[in-house]
Amino acid sequence: MRALVPAVLLAALLPVSPAAAQSAGPYDPVRRDPLGTVLINGATPYTLGSRRLEVLFTHRFQQPVNQGGDSHNLWGLDSGADVGIGLAWGAAPHLDLSVYRASFQEDFELAGKFLVLEQAQRLPLTVAVRAGVDHLRRPGVEDPTRPFAQLLLARKLALGVNLLVSPSWVRDTPRLRNAFNVPLGLSFPIPGNSLIEIEYIPANRDLGDSLDAWHVALSKSVGGHIFEIVAGNSRATTLDQMLGGDSAAGFRKRDVRLGFNIVRDFSFF
């Protein structure tokens, strides 16, 4: 049953007729919703555009709210946190180059993303390819250099409603070699010009005790900023820690951890 979920959602990306166009020409891209280049933890297929800079800050608290989190430790907010900072540069209209550093195991993620197609009246999908490497600088980490590749697919179904499917491979996770998985994403609008975003990564069937990872975020776009309040069970924010359901930080299916993302875009024209 678990294996059917990505297949069903992938099929949903390919309807008989495309969504209602929001642009005049049949190949003019539909207007994007403010998802950014990263949904919650995983990459979207969207690029920044030429000569644009994006700065990303992530914060994931270590203490689960439902395991010892209470008013005395502000429901886990007094605990330590994994912090990440990233930069992405629009090197060309359809090409982004990015670097992201997570404090957990000093994990650097270097990547390039190329936007192949963008959804339009006669193009039902947005398609991008992304490739790069995670490099962990913490001494003692096994297989610290971990190449990866992704096919990033998205379809805008209605205003604020987006479905994302991202078949992905990474050479090494904490416990797997040549791990493949299909992260899924969904967004839908709520009052106040905000979005609810959902990410789900199925447990990896190549590892018996792999766990499903899930995250939910309340996302608000204000000017050149995107602010997200995040809840989820895993602290992983890099692909090598996500795809295997075996993050070295450890997590349980029913954990609920809080966090936030702050994104700021700059234009240099």
Model-derived segments and spans:
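Conserved nucleotide-cofactor-binding alpha/beta core module
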Residues: F180-V182
